[in-house]
Amino acid sequence: STRVRSSAASDVYKRQVDVACSSGKDMEKFWEIFDERLELCHEALMYRHNRLKGTPSDVAPILWQNGALARLKKGETIDKLLYNGYSTISLGYAGLCECTRYMTGKSHTDPEAKPFALEVMKHMNEACAKWREESHIDFSLYGTPLESTTYKFSRCLQERFGIIPGVTDKNYITNSYHIHVTEEIDAFDKLSFEAQFQELSPGGAISYVEVPNMQNNIDAVLAVMKHIYDNIMYAELNTKSDYCQCCGYEGEIQIISDEHGKLIWECPNCGNQDQAKMNVARRTCGYIGTQFWNQGRTQEIKERVMHL
């Protein structure tokens, strides 16, 4: 899939889990398929780039003529802004965790599996560097947040490859380079580990740690923030801040399964299950939203473990 963002010409997402499962754990075949999919992504990105060429600045004067992104003349095209680092064109990726587990049988936090995961990242960076040199277009590697697409991708994987424990057995796949949300690891080790992968994701990356209510433990918050400052480029703390409009409960609204196996939200105090009468705040993909999510993302939220 592709999309346009301000300050970015285009994104294309690469599903690493599909590449791994398609290889049947044959490492040589994995890299062969990997390069084939990379070239397909390259073609899609170039299609988006070429589609933008010739666009007149008049389509968005605030952006292109009045200084938000540039000061072009009326009738002038945006072509020159698509080259030489003025805008980025992003190769996205997701599911490094599941990809590594399928190919190695281990989490990418395992010392025996980490070199493979890093090689995958380096390989994509090398492809971006090659395309950049050839075209003078600023290709860059971008850690895909997936948002609601995580559910669609996981369902497609299940249809294609069946249920593979630790790989396709969830209704979500892990964002970008992240450690799996169910893996027990403390906040400091998680941030230090993921910092190695952020360095290889220059087009965009963010890490998270899950924490309980920290109002009475400010020293711990400051310790984590200092660790972030000293060790990683960009990271955030996730906490839970919910409110039930029926009984006034403030805390964590629970995710439970109904009689049909569907995940729903329920107030642990009064049993309220009406989403219109509760405020649930959870971070998804960089944003703390109060909307509700599809079944895949909801399962991912439910299964997040605490890191403090």
Where are these regions (language model features)?
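Single conserved hydrophobic/aromatic residue that forms the stacking wall/gate
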Residues: T2-A9, Y13
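Inter-helical turn/loop segments and adjacent helix faces that build the functional surface
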Residues: A20-E32, Y102-K114
